[in-house]
Amino acid sequence: MPGWLTLPTLCRFLLWAFTIFHKAQGDPASHPGPHYLLPPIHEVIHSHRGATATLPCVLGTTPPSYKVRWSKVEPGELRETLILITNGLHARGYGPLGGRARMRRGHRLDASLVIAGVRLEDEGRYRCELINGIEDESVALTLSLEGVVFPYQPSRGRYQFNYYEAKQACEEQDGRLATYSQLYQAWTEGLDWCNAGWLLEGSVRYPVLTARAPCGGRGRPGIRSYGPRDRMRDRYDAFCFTSALAGQVFFVPGRLTLSEAHAACRRRGAVVAKVGHLYAAWKFSGLDQCDGGWLADGSVRFPITTPRPRCGGLPDPGVRSFGFPRPQQAAYGTYCYAEN
């Protein structure tokens, strides 16, 4: 009858349509990957210190019996840290992060992980793994924190830290050792520093925007690398990373010694700010103060967001340093930090 497809014509049409769809989708057998877990729409989740972050993990369907295992892939180490295991009904947390982590459970196929009170050490790569006893599968996501990288050296001068001392020094200044990706991001934002420093992965590098002879030669700008280093014996500076503050930094004027600076902050219900506090206040709160002030490590610094004459002498915003004056020198104010 006119207007009706014949059987051979219908078969040819269906074969053509299947072929086009098959080519567009790819052959599942030739592209191994998740069968139960859906690939994440965004593989990088952005957050900041103190926030609540959600790492999405969603099942397309559920096998008859399964568990979901969340873990954190530790940078520079061939191991994963277990965070949480759930069977869809009950969940159990493990380790220091497990106490701040829970399942979102927005619906029956939701295996997303919620992390409360995000900390600096939470940044990194995470794995959501479905275990069904036959063919396990996983998806990976990265938690990225908004922050700022700052170079750090002690009062004794440059190249004093082995890897473990550099790690401790950053933590004492309200930070942690920066990762390579954090240093790279800082370089794209203008960080130019000619002293090599440890990174979290155990590498030693330094960022150069203006190539020059005393700073790795006159080659192209970039991140210079010293290659593999001995974590115990080799000594360099540190590149630290910090993020948004839970409190505020403020300046107390005066001509104070370091001990008088501590007393001045205590009278105001605060403590002398750490280096990481000052960098975070400069980066996230726009702190701009053309006065040197004591910090907790004994250094004297001041933050500039709007460069101007007779205020550091440099054309770019940043945190300027007067080094480490004698603690008894009564010549500076102080920067205090108070929790909200």
Curated annotation (Swiss-Prot):
InterPro entries: C-type_lectin-like/link_sf, CTDL_fold, Hyaluronan_bind_Proteoglycan, Ig-like_dom, Ig-like_dom_sf, Ig-like_fold, Ig_sub, Ig_V-set. Residues 1-26 form the signal peptide. GO terms for biological process: cell adhesion; central nervous system development; establishment of blood-nerve barrier; extracellular matrix assembly; skeletal system development. CDD domains: Link_domain_HAPLN_module_1, Link_domain_HAPLN_module_2. Disulfide bonds join C57-C128, C170-C240, C194-C215, C265-C336, C290-C311. GO terms for cellular component: extracellular matrix; extracellular space; node of Ranvier; perineuronal net; synapse. GO terms for molecular function: hyaluronic acid binding. It holds the Pfam family Xlink. Keywords: Disulfide bond, Extracellular matrix, Hyaluronic acid, Immunoglobulin domain, Repeat, Secreted, Signal. Gene3D superfamilies: Immunoglobulins, Mannose-Binding Protein A, subunit A. Expressed only in adult brain. Residues 148-242, 245-338 form the Link domain. It is found in: Secreted, Extracellular space, Extracellular matrix. Residues 34-144 form the Ig-like V-type domain. Mediates a firm binding of versican V2 to hyaluronic acid. May play a pivotal role in the formation of the hyaluronan-associated matrix in the central nervous system (CNS) which facilitates neuronal conduction and general structural stabilization. Binds to hyaluronic acid. Belongs to the HAPLN family. This is Hyaluronan and proteoglycan link protein 2. The lineage of its organism: Eukaryota, Metazoa, Chordata, Craniata, Vertebrata.
